[in-house]
Every structure is written in structure tokens, then in C-alpha cells.
Amino acid sequence: MSTEHMEELNDQQIVRREKMAALREQGIDPFGKRFERTANSQELKDKYANLDKEQLHDKNETATIAGRLVTKRGKGKVGFAHLQDREGQIQIYVRKDAVGEENYEIFKKADLGDFLGVEGEVMRTDMGELSIKATHITHLSKALRPLPEKFHGLTDVETIYRKRYLDLISNRESFERFVTRSKIISEIRRYLDQKGFLEVETPVLHNEAGGAAARPFITHHNAQNIDMVLRIATELHLKRLIVGGMERVYEIGRIFRNEGMDATHNPEFTSIEVYQAYADFQDIMDLTEGIIQHAAKSVKGDGPVNYQGTEIKINEPFKRVHMVDAIREITGVDFWQDMTLKEAKAIAAEKKVPVEKHYTEVGHIINAFFEEFVEETLIQPTFVYGHPVAVSPLAKKNPEDQRFTDRFELFIMTKEYGNAFTELNDPIDQLSRFEAQAKAKELGDDEATGIDYDYIEALEYGMPPTGGLGIGIDRLCMLLTDTTTIRDVLLFPTMK
């Protein structure tokens, strides 16, 4: 038992345990049993929205509701309270002469946080509030701890993230944010299902990290006596399924990267990866735009999205620009020109762009320029395509300029929201790219990956031309809920 549960009980906790014992003495289970509701709070509000006090009285409608007791007032023989369920709150009006003395005692002794079931007549008060005039109250569950004092809006950030259940009880805005997240994911699934994609599941435990540039979490399989890694991407397994003939697949799932934490990064996060046979990166651009716009429309409607005071024109066609053109437009440096690594490093020094030890190709310098000068300017949805081969080990080379790949990233509000490309399906080229990554790893690039020989073997059986995509679900949820930190869209973010 943890020290937290061995703590000395305070006065309120002692009183609540005494009430629990009293319920048992009356033959009432303090933690209840199954209870049949006829409606939730919002259903009743919607159903009777257009009826005034007299009309409701004439209809003589009844309902059975249940929820957590969150407010309570009144003295003597009459009381008012609010029950909170998943949809919101509804008032209950309790009279001793309507429920009986014994039943009224259950209400009277109920504490905030307890769960009650209420049967009664649907009514409207003189103030116009829809309420249930109780005819019977059922005790459903005893809360042995009082709700936080700041119940109507938990404000302590540490408590919000560590004890999300308290945040959900007390912050309706937070509750609705996670409902919105669920809807976003459901709508993405719906969009892809309707386009003939098959949702699949691939392993979380891998023998070799691959499919992304990231440091993995390492674990050990006792029975096999081998070290394994938690997946840093789902890419290579999904492309094996394209080899197997599935043609259109996607997976929404947890990814694990042993890296730093900040406003937009958590060590475990949710991504969606999508692969489509006989498609290229241009087709995947169209698909990406469709996914993002469909998700936005489902929770925000047809118009633009407001994020932290900036209007994001997510409902309009996304801008498309080559990485080299974007760099030239901002810095004047033209990387279309052929140049040696030495020349590129000299330009980087002139522009004060840091050069890492593992930058062994001009493509590394080009990417560094993009990150240094261009990313921070990308506010409206923008597809940046044409990444250098050096930083795109799984993407197909552009047939017209082999220095670059048919790859794109989607940027909104300076952040990357998606990464996609025409997949490399040449096993010989893929092996040489893997070998270059392995060399970079030896030179100190912690994010470079090793060689997945099994994946090379799969490619040798033949993979059709394929387009692939990865989108960070958490960042998309941040955008569509106007949230500034990833922890506010993760129910249980990583904590120390």
C-alpha cells in the first residue's frame, strides 16, 4: 500500500466513513448496484427546451436520472441539488413529503461527490431552470474523499495532470476537450474507412527501431532473452502489408520516443500512418488535406479555425512549396545550384547556421537552413515538399532531380503536423540508405536507425508504387481545441 493511502484520515474523511457505516446498518450498499436511467441531463434539456413551467406541469412527464452530487442547498423539509453526468448538470428538487422521511434522510446525509439516482417529475422552477422533482432517491456510491475546495475549476496544474479524474469532474471545458479529441479520431477513421482503407494493428515491440529518426525505449524479453525496443513508428510493418497485397491500410496507435518533453512533445503519443498502393506523394497531399479538413469540419464547422487569436484558413486549399524555393525566398540562398559540401558549409557559416558533425551531405545543410529560417514563418497550412535524400531515408528520389525526394511535411502555426512521401520500393537503394543511417549513428546521430534486413527482404518480393503518410494526432487535437500544451490533450501525460 502506498504512503498516500496510509495517510492519517482527516475529519471529513472520518465523517464520510461513518456515513458509509450508517448506510450499511440501514441495509443499503454504500457502493450501490446497477441503476436504470431513462435519460441524461442534456437529453432532458433538449427534449423540453421549448416548454415553459405551466406546459411542463400539464404534460406530467417523468424521468429517471443518475449522477454525481455536485451542489446541495436547503434546510428542513426541502432541498435543491445538482447532479452531474457525462453530458452536464441538472437540478433536482427534493421535498420530504414527496419522497418520504426515510428516503429524504438519504438525500439529507448525502455528501458532495456521492452518486445518486433520482426518479421524479420533470418540471421548471420559477426561475425557469429545468429540474426533476424527486419522488424517490437511490444511493448509488459513497465518495470517501471530499472534492477539492476549488471544485468549480481545478487550477493547480500538477493536480490537473496527475489526477485527471479530478480535472474531469471539476473542469467542464477540460471534459469537453477530451470528448472533442475522441470525435476527431472517430471522424478520421470514418473518412479513411469510406475511402476503402483497412484499419490494422502492428506490433508495439520491435527487434530494430525503424521508420523514423528518433531514440527508442529499450526493454528486455525474458522468455526469448533478447533486447527489444518500443516502436518509434508503425511504417515498416505497414509497408510489409502493402507488399502482402492489402493496398490501402492505416493504423492509429501509440508511438514511443525516448526524447525530451515540451509543449508539443510527450514520450508516448498517438499517430496515424496511412499507406496507399499505386499512389504518389501528390495523391497523399490531397488525402492529407482531406483528412485534416474533414476532422476540422466535424468539430469546428465549415469556416476557418481560430488558434490562439490567429485565424487558420484550414477550410481553404493548402499552400504547396518546394523546400529549396522556400529557403531562397527568405534567405536569398539558392540550393538549386550544384555545390560541394565544403561550399555549402561555407554558406552555412556565413548565415550562422550550426553544422553538426554528422552533416556529411549538402542535403543536411539544406535541411538545417529550412529549420533555421523557414519553419518559423509557416503559419497557414503549408505543404513543404522536396526534402533532400540525406534526411529522407525511406522516401523515393525525385525522378527529375535525384538530390531530392518526393516527400512533404505539413506545417501549421510553425509546427509539423504531417510527414509523407512516395515510398522507396527499390530494395537495393533502401539498403544503401539504411547503411548511410547506420554510419550517421556511428558518427553520433542518436536519432539515426540501424538496418532492418527483414524489411529489405520484404521489399525484394516486390512492393507496388506507394504513397505513405504520418500525422500526429495530439498536435491536431491541440490545434482544433485551441490548446497550447500537449498535456492538455493527453488524458494521462507523462509525469516525473
Curated annotation (Swiss-Prot):
Compartmental location: Cytoplasm
A cellular-component GO term for this protein: cytosol
Keywords recorded for this protein, A-Z: Aminoacyl-tRNA synthetase, ATP-binding, Cytoplasm, Ligase, Magnesium, Metal-binding, Nucleotide-binding, Protein biosynthesis
GO biological process: one example: lysyl-tRNA aminoacylation
Cofactor binding summary note: Binds 3 Mg(2+) ions per subunit.
Cofactor list: Mg(2+)
Catalysed reactions listed for this entry: tRNA(Lys) + L-lysine + ATP = L-lysyl-tRNA(Lys) + AMP + diphosphate
Coiled-coil ranges (or none): none
InterPro entries cross-referenced by the UniProt entry: Aa-tRNA-synt_II, aa-tRNA-synth_II, aa-tRNA-synth_II/BPL/LPL, Lys-tRNA-ligase_II, Lys-tRNA-ligase_II_bac/euk, Lys-tRNA-ligase_II_N, Lys-tRNA-synth_II_C, NA-bd_OB-fold
Binding-site residues for Mg(2+) 2, renumbered to this chain: E416
CDD domains: LysRS_core (cd00775), LysRS_N (cd04322)
Family membership noted in the UniProt record: Belongs to the class-II aminoacyl-tRNA synthetase family.
Subunit-level organization: Homodimer.
Name of the protein in question: Lysine--tRNA ligase
Organism of this sequence: Streptococcus pneumoniae (strain Hungary19A-6)
Lineage: Bacteria, Bacillati, Bacillota, Bacilli, Lactobacillales
Gene transcribed to yield this protein: lysS
